[in-house]
Amino acid sequence: MFNNLGDRFKDIFKKVSGQGKLTEANMKDALREVRLALLEADVNYGVAKNFVSKIREKALGEEVISGVNPTQQFVKIVHDELVEVLGGTNVQIAKSPKNPTIIMLSGLQGAGKTTFAGKLAKYLRSKGETPLLIGADVYRPAAKKQLKVLAEQVKVSSFTIDESTDVNEICRKGLEEAGKIHATYVIIDTAGRLHIDEQLMGELQGIKDNFKPHEILLVVDGMTGQDAVNVAKTFNEQLDITGVVLTKLDGDTRGGAALSVKEVAGKPIKFISEGEKLDDIAPFHPDRLASRILGMGDVVSLVEKAQEAIDEKEAKKMEEKFRKNQFDFEDFLKQFKMIRKMGSIAGIMKMIPGVDTSA
């Protein structure tokens, strides 16, 4: 994700290096390159234009601070603006003072709602919560079965009514079940469509009106670029969503949706998903992503992944074995398996500052 954009920014920063001051003359070409880089990454035109304008305002005429060269100044300005356009700060998922907290997932068909429901349930379970998955997609034949399988895989409860096509009945009885099992979160997986239509919106509006969800998350396919932004804008206008989830951000995704959705739709990105595994879910932190785009790494996320994947007691045992020269192949294999839990090696490398991952 964002590899091409990151490479473009590196080239731009190299061109700025060696300047004694950030002036209109040496900024003109750099800002033009920034705008082109953003547009090539499928960033919304208006967002790209505003982004460049703000950089120009901050950069032009700034005196070089003692010990900081113009390139470093320019990098900081770009970084700060990236953080802002991505949303500024992390917006956490809602938590109702009275259980359960109800989360409704919405979106078009194929965006990955059902899979994300499983990922979110696993994430919440890892935080000590008790989630219940409700299958309210009554149109896709395999949806309810898929939800049940995912629930079993992540070791949480699920609720569906195979013979019912009444989403309100399913949600009502599902919430009754949530009370019986003392669920702290309820995740409602709704039906998608190939395109936005009145029936889809009417059904979602009905769930919203009848069950008052604390979160209405729109799940969008990050690979669709500008289409994802347009979908987010339309859903927000009709449903007043509380946040966006970007899926499928692995592979060759250009990243335009992530850089545009907050400013265009006016709602924060709350989660991103960069892979197919049920662990591939992360709360969205604008500052961390901005640092990764600019090649600064993301040490905080790296440490968090390590804490989740590495058993502290096991790590202390390994340390003792190292000191006593008793570390063997079986121990090496255990260490390797723990590292594998952190994700792909390529993903880990991207979080380390200064490591070139373009090769």
Where would I find each of the regions flagged by the language model?
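Conserved phosphate/pyrophosphate-binding and hydrolysis machinery centered on Walker-type P-loop NTPases
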Residues: 2, 20-28, 41, 45-49, ...
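Long amphipathic alpha-helical segments used for membrane anchoring, targeting, substrate engagement
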Residues: 2-19, 288-359
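Alpha-helical scaffold segments in soluble metabolic enzymes
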Residues: 4, 11, 33, 77-84, ...
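Primarily NTPase-proximal linker/entry elements flanking Walker-type ATP/GTP-binding cores
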Residues: 9-136, 143-163, 170-190
